[in-house]
Amino acid sequence: MEVYMDNSATTRTFPEVAELMTKIMCEDYGNPSSLHMKGVEAEKYLRYAKETLARILKVEERELLFTSGGTESDNMALIGCALANCRRGNHLITTQIEHPAILQTMRYLETQGYRVTYLPVDPCGRIRLEDLRRAMTPETILVSIMHTNNEIGALQPIEEAGALIKQMNPDTLFHVDAVQGFGKSRIYPKKMHIDLLSVSGHTVSYTHLRAHETLRHLV
């Protein structure tokens, strides 16, 4: 008998979901941007998905952007925000135990002239808010902290970190990689002071972007 214990990373697809997806791929396969009947039917599924996610997160539908996966969501959030806000500063903050999708993107941004501070963690894998406070500067344009660590499961004090960031500089953007945490923890971007939230349903993902924020297009 097989025992699978990695559901937080990738969960086995429910039979009813697989059945619906098979129907969509075989029958309702139109481009949701097209005006013909197949496109209209496909757009209904997309709209329903956005309505459902917006209701769960307590955000507006227009604040949700669908992507191909968690890595694209993280890349778009970090690079897009860095490029769009480079005139305000060039300092970014993250942690030493982020997913490679974050760490490698931060290293790329360093090659483009951005300064990055990597926060250490305590023995339980959690950041210290005092370290975050000391790392913040007037040049800090973005802070990225994961919700749940993909290796050790450590939960970060996201709401407290978000409140601290906004207290010190309301213009500093707060990005949270919640690929591992969404669906297991209650995550409300507005309540938790989150400007950008990356989530994956494996492998269709989305990024939440606060309504008045902008991203520089990557493509």
Where are these regions (language model features)?
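Extreme N-terminal starter segment of soluble prokaryotic enzymes
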Residues: 1-4
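Conserved small/polar residues in nucleotide/adenosyl-binding loops
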Residues: 207-217
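Conserved beta-loop-alpha segment that forms the PLP phosphate-binding cup at the N-terminus of a helix
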Residues: 41-54, 59-89, 98-105
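Conserved active-site segment immediately N-terminal to the catalytic lysine
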Residues: 173-176, 182, 188-208
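Active-site phosphate-binding strand-loop segment of PLP-dependent enzymes
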Residues: 117, 121-181
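Glycine-rich phosphate-binding segment of PLP-dependent enzymes
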Residues: 9-59
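PLP-dependent aminotransferase-like
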Residues: 79-139
